[in-house]
């Protein structure tokens, strides 16, 4: 009973706080009149936020993604999307940002196990042996000193919408956990707030709902994953393009950045994961990030500059050739040669 009273009370407080904030965002901004404030804000509260992976930041215009961005990871079903998202989330914790991981597919215990494995670099068997409990506790104490938390929530697919996630973020913030990064695994399985029946409309609206949620809750970023079409599987060894996105092309309109997880047979053998840029609003039209993968330990480590240089020498030329052959956007000479600016 007390808990229900607390819920009602915390909602009232939240409402009062929301209403008392000056409605700054509703007002237009002035190019000339606002110069001083704008320059100060750029330094004090940068609106571009780097992600944990250097190579992805390097292919953007400003070394990161604008706040409230919605980014999408593409791959075929049952591939490495969740694996990649777990490692991304781990990176954000190291950047002192609390993460909410909303899962529609795997189950929260499995996701949490993957996080712990990835963090302490152990296999599932080693984790369950109990021999590494001390190591886990030591690692988590270090994260606790950063004042961050990772929250994993399993939600029913096709029923849960962004209003539920919003309530959850508010509830966590009331408990002192300031969620700044949202991972949704995956958004295509959520219901839209408008309760659309048709998949195409539902998915389009879910992405709009997520964008609105990111802005309203002042999230740094939202990452989600999405499946590719059957046709898209042909591009797994090269690079996906925007027509490979299953379910709704509107995702391209509403996402800030879309990357695909690719690898050739040789790269698979060498445990290399290649993250290829499909489309982004503010940065280079093409580019990639490379990672060394250990799926057994759920760990994905970014290439060093030296490893990247070696990779480009060994694989680079061959890869560029096959990219041009596959009717990829890079076969369009003009687009390929355009190496900067908005696209």
Locations of the language-model features?
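The Walker A/P-loop phosphate-binding site
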Residues: 23-122, 142, 150, 342
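Cytosolic-facing regulatory segments adjacent to core modules
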Residues: 60-61, 91-178, 192, 288-290
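A short beta-strand-to-loop transition that corresponds to the Sensor-1 phosphate-sensing loop
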Residues: 105-106, 224-229, 264
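C-terminal regions of RecA-like/P-loop NTPase motor modules
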Residues: 162-182, 215-217, 231-343
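Helical hairpin unit composed of two closely spaced alpha helices linked by a short loop
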Residues: 180-212
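Structural recognition of the conserved hydrophobic beta-strand(s) that form the central parallel beta-sheet
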Residues: 183, 220-227
């Amino acid at each position: 009973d007390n808990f229900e009273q607390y819920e009602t009370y915390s909602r009232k407080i939240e409402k009062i706080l929301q209403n008392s904030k000056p409605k700054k965002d509703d007002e237009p901004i002035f190019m000339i009149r606002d110069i001083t404030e704008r320059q100060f804000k750029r330094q004090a509260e940068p609106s571009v936020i780097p992600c944990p992976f250097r190579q992805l930041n390097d292919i953007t215009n400003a070394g990161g993604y604008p706040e409230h961005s919605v980014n999408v990871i593409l791959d075929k079903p049952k591939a490495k999307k969740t694996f990649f998202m777990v490692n991304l989330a781990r990176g954000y914790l190291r950047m002192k940002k609390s993460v909410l991981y909303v899962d529609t597919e795997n189950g929260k215990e499995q996701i949490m196990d993957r996080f712990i494995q990835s963090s302490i670099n152990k296999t599932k068997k080693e984790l369950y042996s109990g021999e590494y409990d001390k190591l886990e506790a030591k690692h988590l104490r270090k994260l606790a000193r950063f004042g961050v938390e990772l929250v994993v929530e399993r939600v029913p697919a096709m029923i849960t919408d962004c209003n539920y996630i919003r309530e959850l973020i508010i509830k966590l913030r009331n408990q002192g956990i300031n969620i700044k990064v949202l991972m949704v695994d995956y958004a295509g399985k959520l219901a839209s707030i408008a309760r659309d029946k048709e998949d195409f409309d539902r998915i389009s609206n879910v992405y709009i709902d997520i964008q609105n949620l990111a802005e309203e809750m002042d999230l740094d970023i939202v990452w989600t994953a999405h499946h590719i079409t059957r046709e898209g599987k042909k591009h797994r060894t090269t690079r996906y393009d925007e027509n490979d996105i299953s379910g709704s092309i509107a995702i391209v309109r509403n996402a800030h950045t879309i990357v695909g997880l690719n690898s050739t047979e040789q790269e698979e053998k060498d445990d290399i994961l290649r993250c290829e840029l499909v489309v982004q609003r503010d940065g280079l039209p093409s580019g990639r990030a490379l990672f060394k993968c250990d799926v057994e330990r759920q760990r994905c480590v970014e290439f060093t500059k030296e490893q990247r240089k070696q990779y480009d020498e060994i694989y680079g030329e061959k890869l560029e050739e096959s990219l041009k052959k596959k009717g990829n956007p890079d076969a369009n000479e003009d687009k390929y040669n355009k190496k900067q600016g908005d696209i």
